[in-house]
Amino acid sequence: MEFIDVIKERAKSSIKTIVLPETEDMRTLEAADKILKEGIAKLVLVGNEEAVKKSAAEGGFDISGAQIVDPATSEKTQGYIDKLVELRQKKGMTPEQAKEILLNQYLYYGVMMVKMGDADGMVSGACHSTADTLRPCLQILKTKPGTKLVSAFFLIIVPDCEYGANGAFVFGDSGLNQNPNPEELAAIAASSAESFKLLVQEEPVVAMLSHSTKGSAKHADVDKVVEATKIAKEQNPDLALDGEFQLDAAIVPSVGASKAPGSPVAGKANVLIFPDLDAGNIGYKLAQRLAKAEAYGPITQGIAKPVNDLSRGCSADDIVGVVAITSVQCQAQD
């Protein structure tokens, strides 16, 4: 069974309700059709009911099993307006402003549904930037208790791969934090390890990546990773984590044994922590395009309730996969 099929089966074991607010995008409607046919999740589509149904019919998609919520007519909208004003009153939000936002920005409406318990999670980003997707989450849902940093990872599945967990990796942070400091990098490592264990159901082995392996190069950028590794080890003494490593030393056993003999992580890593967003973003796209890897994400970690982003280049199948992943994250909060 393919990895994403395992995730789908786990999603089906305890059905969750997921909001898809980007109903103006045909990929969303195609994904909704597939999700409903496969029984992966209950769906809420946000938008004008007539317009959504018309678009679905034009695309040949069956969304009859989804709930369509129109903010302009829903009986719950006023309650969302009142709650949004309450949450943002320190920022000076008025009822008029809250109404304007919720009637016209469906991402905010979807997040309010999650906040109020009318949905378990949300997936968006097919036609919005990561910033647009995550802004309402940070304003409304806030961070998970005990978490200071929201970060993002990609779940990477490389076909016919002997490395990682049979080709399964988590790449973090590949979608959100531009240039994390050592403390933030350590937090990203801990969160990514937790996400790997939840989704892959194997023990995480975390490599802190650099252009240096165990002091082979000297630079301030290397020092940052060395310090992050030290902090992460102190904060997570039971976690298999080490660094700094070049990529080959992290995942190839023979190279790891040569460059970092005695390391419990070298050559065995399945969670790869990149030093900055440039490296992480380039890394996941290289794996996706050159190694034909499946890349699901950016999946967020650290938000109080599961809300996930999509690449704007995503396919309908990518959306299906991220909805399944989001459902599994929701199950973990039960």
Segments from the language model and where they lie:
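Anion-binding alpha/beta catalytic cores of soluble intermediary-metabolism enzymes, centered on
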Residues: 1-266, 271-334
